[in-house]
UniProtKB/Swiss-Prot annotation:
Record SMART domains: AAA (SM00382), ClpB_D2-small (SM01086), zf-C4_ClpX (SM00994)
NCBIfam families referenced in this protein's UniProt entry, alphabetically: clpX (TIGR00382), PRK05342.1 (NF003745)
Gene Ontology biological process terms, A to Z: cell division; proteolysis involved in protein catabolic process
GO CC, alphabetical: HslUV protease complex
Top-level division of the source organism's lineage: Bacteria
Protein name per its UniProtKB record: ATP-dependent Clp protease ATP-binding subunit ClpX
Record gene name: clpX
Purpose of the protein: ATP-dependent specificity component of the Clp protease. It directs the protease to specific substrates. Can perform chaperone functions in the absence of ClpP.
Domain ClpX-type ZB: 1-54
Amino acid sequence: MFENEDNKTPATCSFCGKTEDQVKSMISGPGVYICNECVELAQSIIDTETKAEAQKDFTNVPTPHEIVDTLNQYVVGQEEAKKTLAVAVYNHYKRVNASLSDDDGTELQKSNICLVGPTGSGKTFLAQNLARILNVPFAIADATTLTEAGYVGEDVENILLKLLQNADYDVERAQRGIIYIDEIDKIAKKSENVSITRDVSGEGVQQALLKILEGTIANVPPQGGRKHPQQEFIQIDTTNILFIVGGAFDGIETMVKNRLGDKTIGFGVDSKQEYDPDKSLMQQIIPEDLLKFGLIPEFIGRLPILTALEKLTEEDLVRILTEPKNALIKQYQKLVSFDDVSLKFEDDAVKEIAHLAIERNTGARGLRSIVEATMRDIMFDIPSEDNIKEVVITKDTVDGKSKPEIVK
């Protein structure tokens, strides 16, 4: 029994005035007491305010036009994918808002998204920017690290842990975040035929992902790793988490051509020099093609929105280097400006960077490594040289044939 040390009377809750005899438990602090009933009431008030705040966050979701306009500031090209994603995200968060406001009981089903596109076409970048526009927690997972329960590798619940960590362990915020699962094509079944051997990183992972994609209460180990009976879990409802999956799906164009009856593929076709056929084929991908590729029907059913990203051209890469708000060249210009040096890339140099990325088949993802290699030596020298005013990068600099031109 808590007692007041001055008069030896039973402790009294500083908030409601009840004594410890009238409540289940009493928590003491320096000169104050609070009973379990007041703690529960305070928690109820906080929960109500949190829900109201969460509802408020999604009453002003940007319109699809506003989402695309913002994406255009950072992402070059991929107009069809932007439009599809903008509508899907807008409808998703309208659905979230409806579920928070306890509308008329009409249940709106979740529509997760599948992005198909070559390496370096901007799948991850699009998902990242969507999360930034909406100001929601975002996490990226690699499907190739996942295995079904009981095998060495990551459980699918670890994907949710990454989102929870990025939400600073705020479960309410995490439950309305976005998760992007990359390399989803790598967990396709190895063949359409049933095998007696286990496919622990393929179909088994697809099966394990079904529940969290659809919406379930998942038990997430707060420290990650495998589950064990003595471990405490954090429960996360995945119903309002938007899942975006993406993959290159190498070879799917062949499946599309075969389905459409186009048999023009052969040794005489130089696909590296022709982009238009690939673009039209990518836009004609349907769920049937994903099924033939190795995704199981149940998994495809959880991804009702399917959109394709185009292979980036050399012209696209030039624009990516120069146009967006955070364009790569602008980033390096800002870096050297801290040393009071201006940086100029000649037009031919920019085109050569884009050309090398196309040659290496790395898309936009490979641009930074090329620019970094071009800039490394001069960025090493600039801090030690007080008289450098301007650095000019030429085509020969990019090719490694000459050093940058320096103006002093």
